[in-house]
Regions:
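Acidic, divalent-metal-binding catalytic cores of TOPRIM
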Residues: 162, 178-210, 219
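Non-catalytic accessory segments of DNA primases and related replication-initiation nucleases
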Residues: 1-83, 91, 103, 113, ...
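RNase H-like polynucleotidyl transferase catalytic core
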Residues: 164-170, 210-222
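Phosphate-handling DNA/RNA-contact segment within nucleic-acid enzymes
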Residues: 62-185, 199-200
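Short, surface-exposed amphipathic charged segments that create phosphate/polyanion-binding patches used
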Residues: 179-183, 222-236
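A charged alpha-helical hairpin associated with nucleic-acid processing machineries
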Residues: 99, 141-144, 215-219, 231-253
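Short, surface-exposed acidic/glycine-rich loop or hinge patches that mediate macromolecular interfaces
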Residues: 151, 170, 193-194, 218
Length: 253
């Protein structure tokens, strides 16, 4: 039996707490990476997340011990360069999954110039997939969803209990929009910048009838990730719960 949506939220809540203790200070992240390597993430709740693969720490030696050179699936996931270099070394890793929960690519995060590295997987297409597709195959699948741009935006909303999918960018597509049919209502939250505002004003995500875009005017808050840096999580949750009671196409919070 697969994980229920509530169990999934609990895992993401543990992941959220872990990541937010780091901030984006490179020295702090480096220390945490060393601690993870030395102590294998002591928290039992985070261990649960590791086991489910919703937030995973992988070292190259562990993968090499799996015989990745001979393993077709690992090669097709694009985990290693042709020279055998582990592409996501010293990064925190988020798996991209299909709606059955199969890992189809990995995204490695670290607060450097690159921020995110996605493995060149044979199974992955950003044009066709959201980050968070595994939610569609869960028990008690939610009847509504939020759509955001970034994977951290999604992580934070799911940690509060809100179902959410991430575009992994700004661009929508017919393939992604076909997923809307799984839900009764969709709430789009593009970033609070020039491009994001255009997405809302011109409906570039083609949200279905009865759905809404959510926005705010505070220019110091660019996205959901920023919102969590400026406000308490429970306050954000309360504001969003009030927002989803409204029926307007554009909802200001």
């Amino acid at each position: 039996m697969g994980m229920s949506y509530q169990e999934y939220v609990e895992v993401y809540n543990a992941v959220f707490r872990k990541i937010k203790t780091l901030g984006e200070n490179e020295d702090e992240v480096r220390r945490e990476i060393k601690r993870a390597r030395d102590y294998d993430l002591e928290s039992s709740v985070v261990d649960k997340a590791l086991n489910y693969g919703d937030f995973i720490w992988v070292e190259s030696e562990k993968l090499k011990g799996m015989g990745w050179e001979e393993n077709k699936k690992l090669r097709e996931l694009g985990l290693f360069s042709e020279a055998g270099r582990w592409l996501l070394e010293d990064r925190f890793i988020f798996p991209v999954k299909d709606m059955l929960g199969n890992v189809i690519a990995l995204i490695g995060w670290y607060p450097d110039d690159k921020k995110y590295i996605t493995t060149p997987s044979a199974y992955f297409s950003k044009k066709c997939l959201f980050f968070g597709m595994e939610m569609l195959g869960m028990q008690n699948r939610p009847k509504v969803t939020f759509i955001v741009e970034g994977i951290f935006d999604r992580l934070m909303l799911v940690a509060l209990g809100f179902p959410c999918l991430a575009e992994m960018g700004i661009t929508s597509s017919a393939e992604k929009e076909s997923i809307y049919g799984f839900f009764k209502r969709v709430y789009g939250i593009p970033d609070n910048d020039k491009v994001g505002r255009r997405v809302m004003n011109e409906d570039e995500w083609n949200l279905p009838r009865g759905s809404s875009y959510i926005f705010w005017e505070d220019s110091s808050v660019k996205d959901i990730d920023d919102m969590f840096k400026n406000y308490e999580p429970e306050s954000i949750k309360d504001v969003l719960l009030e927002a989803v009671k409204q029926k307007e196409r554009k909802i200001e919070i």
